[in-house]
From Swiss-Prot:
Disulfide bonds: none annotated. The gene is gatB. It comes from Streptococcus pyogenes serotype M1. Pfam families: GatB_N (PF02934), GatB_Yqey (PF02637). This is Aspartyl/glutamyl-tRNA(Asn/Gln) amidotransferase subunit B. Transmembrane segments: none annotated. One of its GO terms (biological process) is translation. Keywords: ATP-binding, Ligase, Nucleotide-binding, Protein biosynthesis. Heterotrimer of A, B and C subunits. GO terms for molecular function: asparaginyl-tRNA synthase (glutamine-hydrolyzing) activity; ATP binding; glutaminyl-tRNA synthase (glutamine-hydrolyzing) activity.
Length: 479
């Protein structure tokens, strides 16, 4: 029997506000344990939550970016459960009226076609703290993350393969990153993924029993975990077994999933409206204000780069991988840079430099202005393409004017025949054996003179002009 794979994803995105969702504590990552906490985070008796408006702003932006409807009257709910990293014994979340609902995004499939993936809801909530189990027999609780704002984005079960799930996550991460509401760094926990997967016989309308996957710390592991579950569940069903509704974690070392617990249903959390927070009215003016702050998104930029700038689909995809790179490219083109040349540099020397240095483009001194200037002085013959690599490294490390650096460092290409011809004559005088080989008709003897000339000029001879003048002077030797 063959089975159809059904996948839905729950993605938690940490919002990059300065303070937490309901307390004034810093929400920044990487501080000492419990440094970013106060009495609200500790859940002292009598303390009350205070809503961070910036979190609602971010939620509206996310909902708009994901083509969602927005609840004009929004409230929060209590999700009740006990765990050491949750000192209140409940989480403030949203249940029946999330900030966004009924959305969708398009994903690009391997065959080049697109597929629409529906998004059921996006709700705001507070994050829990972090438990660390020490080797000394104690468990430690760090509440820095407690109360950090999250938006949970829940897809419909529209994905039919691990590859589609990977494509959905890639597209979703791009969109969220472009809004500026999160850096979506999985390695820092600002983007976390839970996957729900079930199988059903082809032709059956009813979904099978789902399994939830956790501990998916990379898109690659999401795909691997789902691939393992497809095989595990299919094998179990074919042998007459029954799939339980359970939570499993992906074990990277063993390349498989391991049972964590039998899955609880929503009723186990006993949701009820949060009594300490009011109803929030989101009017059209607020929505329009947030919409005006949104950028053009990757799909629209890719189409523009292909249709208006003549770039390939591959180049357009690479240039829109991050908003900062895309903005850099667009600024360079707006300053008069040739789109293809700017693209080549960004994907070539710039990308190699960033990888080697472990930096992003905003962390180096290169600017759109000095990159465009460098490309211009390559085009007008001031420097060669080979010399430009040295110029680029200087600009990346120090910034400044490309032309000023070239002139100060003595890197200007020699293109004047009045300068080059005497040097060519000196090359002939210094290499009599090569001249003799050339005059005797020895095969490829003329090729050596190019190297001699470039060495004599320390690589500064204009290659095109040098080749033309060499040919002329060598012809005179024959005559």
């Amino acid at each position: 029997m063959n089975f159809e794979t059904i996948i839905g994803l729950e993605v938690h995105v940490e919002l990059n506000t300065n303070s937490k969702i309901f307390s004034p504590s810093s929400a920044h990552f990487g501080e000492d344990p419990n440094a970013n906490t106060n009495v609200i985070d500790w859940s002292f008796p009598g303390v009350l939550p205070v809503m961070n408006k910036g979190v609602i702003d971010a939620g509206i932006k996310a909902a708009l970016a994901l083509n969602m409807d927005i609840h004009k009257e929004m409230h929060f709910d209590r999700k009740n459960y006990f765990y050491p990293d949750n000192p209140k014994a409940y989480q403030i979340s949203q249940f029946d009226e999330p900030i966004g609902y009924n959305g969708w995004i398009d994903i690009k499939l391997e065959d080049g076609s697109t597929k629409k993936i529906r998004i059921e809801r996006a709700h705001l909530e507070e994050d829990a703290g972090k438990n660390t189990h020490g080797t000394d027999g104690y468990s430690y609780v760090d509440l820095n993350r407690q109360g950090v704002p999250l938006i949970e984005i829940v897809s419909e079960a529209d994905m039919r393969s691990p590859e589609e799930a990977y494509a959905y996550l890639t597209a979703l991460k791009e969109i969220i990153q472009y809004t500026g509401i999160s850096d979506v760094k999985m390695e820092e926990g600002s983007m976390r993924v839970d996957a729900n997967i079930s199988l059903r016989p082809y032709g059956q309308e009813q979904f099978g029993t789902k399994t939830e996957l956790k501990n998916l710390n990379s898109f690659s592991n999401v795909r691997k975990g789902l691939e393992f579950e497809v095989e595990r569940q299919a094998k179990l069903l074919r042998s007459g077994g029954v799939i339980r509704q359970e939570t499993r974690r992906y074990d990277e070392a063993n390349k498989g999933t391991i049972l964590m617990r039998v899955k609880e249903g929503a009723a186990d959390y006993r949701y009820f409206p949060e009594p300490d927070l009011p109803l929030y009215e989101i009017d059209d003016a607020w929505i329009d204000e947030m919409r005006a702050q949104l950028p053009q998104f990757p799909a629209q930029r890719r189409a523009k780069y292909e249709e208006e700038l003549g770039l390939s689909a591959y180049d357009a995809s690479q240039l829109t991988a991050t908003k900062v790179l895309s903005d850099f490219f667009e600024t360079a083109v707006s300053l008069g840079g040739d789109a293809k040349q700017v693209s080549n540099w960004l994907q070539g020397e710039v990308a190699q430099f960033l990888n080697a240095e472990g930096k992003t483009i905003e962390e180096i001194a290169l600017t759109p202005e000095n990159l465009v200037e460098m490309i211009a002085i390559i085009a007008d013959g001031t420097i060669s393409s080979k010399m430009a690599k040295k110029v680029f490294v200087h600009l990346a490390k120090n910034g400044g004017s490309a032309r000023a650096y070239v002139e100060k460092a003595g890197l200007v290409q020699i293109s004047d025949p009045a300068v080059l011809v005497p040097i060519i004559h000196q090359v002939f005088a210094d290499n009599e054996a090569a001249v003799a080989d050339f005059k005797s008709g020895k095969r490829n003897a003329d090729k050596a003179f190019t190297g001699f000339l470039m060495k004599a000029t320390k690589g500064q001879a204009n290659p095109q002009v040098a080749q033309q003048l060499l040919a002329q002077e060598l012809q005179k030797l024959r005559d």
